[in-house]
Amino acid sequence: MPGMLRNLIENTFLVVGALFPIVNPIGNTPIFLSLTKGLSGHGRAVLARMIALNGLVLILTSIFIGTHILAFFGISLPVVQVGGGLVVISTGWGLLRHSDDDDASDEDKQKECHEADYSKQAFYPLTLPLTVGPGSISVAITVGANRQEGSEWRWTLIAGMILGSLVIAASIYLSYRFAERIGRTLGDSAMNVIIRISSFILVCIGVQILWNGLSTLLRTVLPR
């Protein structure tokens, strides 16, 4: 039993340690606030729950059947990184060019939205690529591909990966659920600066993901 418990904890921390820095829900909070201006606290709570559930499904799918999905469509991981990197760059660039006048206009429009309309943006862009983007998916697929198929504690491996994914989903929910409180604490001016910086970092992350995939593809065609 001690061996099983230790193996369970190790697998849980493997998933959390690999994914949390990339998912970075706390760092994404300012961008989440920017994209949901005008929504009520209840609306953000609904969105936070939906994004956390969407993220959980994406992570678990990537871990357990991600390699099989890519193989079925004949897609390599570097190609996913190139395509995903372009999407992340586009999202970050759009946020970076978002003016304060646009924010005010969006806020007026979003105040008129019914809560049922929140689901339209819950998956794209709030879950994918903002929260669980191509970088997170690539890491999750890699973690799943490297799992030990013949492990003595097979159930602890599966349970640990599920628990680790649940921890990531919970961190997403809590960060986004209390995003408005964080925004009030920092103030509008500070949040605006943080949003711009976060958007620029998002563009840089997209470029890095794109380059990781592109450099891998180039090595297969260029002479050494």
Predicted regions and their residues:
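Transmembrane helix exit motif
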Residues: 87-110, 205-216
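Juxtamembrane helix-boundary/capping and inter-helix hinge elements in multi-pass membrane proteins
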Residues: 34-45, 78, 113-118, 145-153, ...
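Transmembrane-helix boundary and interhelical-loop signature of multi-pass inner-membrane proteins
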Residues: 40-41, 61-83, 171-215
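A small-residue-rich subset of transmembrane alpha-helices
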Residues: 41-67, 147-183
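Membrane helix-loop-helix hairpins that form the core translocation module of multi-pass transporters
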Residues: 45-99
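Structural signature of hydrophobic alpha-helical transmembrane segments
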Residues: 11-28, 77-86, 158-172, 224
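Small-residue-enriched transmembrane helix starts and helix-helix packing motifs
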Residues: 1-21, 105, 109-127
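Juxtamembrane transmembrane-helix termini in multi-pass membrane transport proteins
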Residues: 11-63
